[in-house]
A protein has these predicted regions:
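Class I SAM-dependent transferase core
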Residues: 1-78, 86-90, 109-112, 117, ...
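Conserved nucleotide-cofactor-binding alpha/beta core module
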Residues: 66, 71-186
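Positively charged
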Residues: 142, 202-203
Length: 203
């Protein structure tokens, strides 16, 4: 898979992504986060199914999402719907000594991802709904919602947990929304043309 991974890294580099993002993709092996039957496709730029019926997003979509999120070294970051843990691992490489929290409502996914990432001391994964965020660890510099929200409204509970300045990335329908908070003013930018699994409210 070395050749396939190198092709993916070249493709991401040609798309103009930052050195930090490229280095994270180089360091983290996607095949460890997907089922055995699809490992051969680990470095194809496609979404892959997980055993529970959800998916792991295609690498180019993840790279674009991370570019919007703008993670920085030392930041505190929350991912809601952390799934396989692949994106958490990528973010961990970028924020270094920062702290990353993942909320995953699916118990099996939460258990598997905890085991995969147990050596990443800056990652904490909790098996719980992400609807209310993680107020006991707030505020966060960045919040990433990794499942499609049911409407355009981002819960106030999440906005209130965002540091000022800070950024939330949230999939809504077939678009990615970038919500930025600066000096108590919240602005929104939309990036259409994507597909995401729906947000699950209950396990």
């Amino acid at each position: 898979m070395i050749v396939q991974k190198e092709k993916l890294l070249i493709s991401l580099k040609n798309q103009g992504y930052s050195d930090e993002i490229i280095k994270a993709f180089a360091k983290i092996d996607r095949e460890f986060f997907v089922p055995d039957q699809v490992k051969i496709y680990s470095y194809d730029d496609i979404a892959l199914p997980l055993d529970d019926g959800s998916t792991i997003s295609q690498p180019s979509t993840i790279a674009f999402t991370l570019s919007l999120l703008e993670p920085k070294q030392g930041q505190s970051i929350l991912e809601i719907g952390s799934g396989s843990g692949y994106v958490l691992a990528l973010i961990s490489e970028i924020v270094k000594n920062g702290k990353i929290y993942g909320l995953e409502i699916n118990q099996n996914l939460a258990i598997k991802s905890k085991k995969l990432l147990e050596k990443n001391l800056n990652i904490e994964i909790l098996n719980r709904s992400g609807l209310e965020g993680l107020p006991e660890q707030a505020p966060f510099d960045r919040i990433l919602i990794s499942a499609s929200c049911p409407d355009r409204g981002i819960p106030y509970s999440l906005l209130s947990q965002l540091r000022d300045p800070g950024i939330i990335i949230a999939p809504v329908g077939t678009s990615l929304l970038k919500i930025r908070k600066i000096n108590k003013i919240v602005s929104e930018e939309e990036f259409p043309g994507f597909s995401f699994v729906p947000f699950v409210l209950k396990s």
